[in-house]
């Protein structure tokens, strides 16, 4: 029994299409879960007297969204399901990774500092970043010749995240300073001196990581 060349070509194209569409459903589910979780947190409102209770209610959806966004980023950037080995990269996944890193630092710091006032803002920013990365997943890039290329990309994204965290802290610092001048402690009582120290530390860390990324990519 022999198969015609046309039949073989059609079978090969179908197999390649099935392989290329592999990450589609998983990426869609992860992105949808992240969007739902962040939207839940963004829409969650409570009186000032119930601030801590509102934060506790937002922990499960925030954790679900944060994890789902990480899964979506891993599937998208790693190039899972691509016919050729390599990675997939673009502006939208880079922005989503940056927001995810900023949110990670916020989740850690919020356990020690009263930063609850920016929770809903970060949730909406993360939701927008997830939607952009889902809509524009980036272009496929074959594996680079240099073994340091993956580390170069990771460090570059990490530096963007650190700079994003520094910008967030600078905005919080300006807000705290304005309230201090008006003699209004404001919700959460943001510690101005701690925010100032953290801002400069994140800027210094971002410069150091970016310098290392440039050195490895030279």
What positions do the PLM features span?
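N-terminal signal-anchor/start-transfer transmembrane helix
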Residues: 28-50, 169
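Structural signature of hydrophobic alpha-helical transmembrane segments
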Residues: 23-35, 86-99
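Cytoplasmic-side transmembrane-helix entry/capping segments in multi-pass membrane proteins
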Residues: 55-63, 93, 116-127
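Hydrophobic alpha-helical segments and helix pairs
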Residues: 108-159
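A generic, lipid-embedded transmembrane alpha helix
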Residues: 61-78, 128-133
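Short, strongly hydrophobic alpha-helical membrane anchors
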Residues: 1-26
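A mid-sequence, solvent-exposed acidic-amphipathic segment
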Residues: 179-218
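Alpha-helical transmembrane segments
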Residues: 29-34, 150-168
């Amino acid at each position: 029994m022999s198969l015609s060349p046309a039949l073989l070509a059609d079978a090969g194209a179908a197999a390649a299409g099935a392989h290329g569409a592999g990450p589609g459903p998983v990426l869609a589910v992860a992105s949808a879960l992240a969007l739902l979780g962040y939207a839940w947190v963004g829409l969650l409102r409570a009186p000032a007297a119930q601030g801590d209770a509102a934060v506790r209610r937002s922990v499960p959806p925030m954790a679900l969204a944060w994890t789902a966004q990480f899964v979506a980023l891993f599937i998208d950037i790693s190039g899972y399901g691509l016919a050729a080995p390599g990675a997939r990269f673009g502006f939208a996944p880079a922005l989503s990774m940056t927001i995810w890193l900023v949110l990670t630092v916020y989740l850690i710091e919020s356990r020690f500092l009263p930063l609850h006032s920016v929770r809903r803002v970060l949730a909406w920013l993360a939701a927008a970043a997830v939607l952009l990365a889902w809509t524009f997943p980036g272009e496929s890039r074959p594996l680079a010749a240099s073994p340091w290329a993956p580390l170069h990309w990771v460090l570059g994204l990490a530096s963007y995240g650190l700079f994003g965290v520094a910008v967030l802290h600078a905005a919080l610092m300006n807000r705290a300073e304005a309230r201090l001048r008006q003699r209004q402690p404001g919700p959460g009582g943001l510690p101005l001196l701690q925010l100032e120290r953290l801002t400069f530390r994140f800027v210094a860390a971002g410069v150091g990581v970016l310098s290392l990324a440039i050195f490895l990519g030279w």
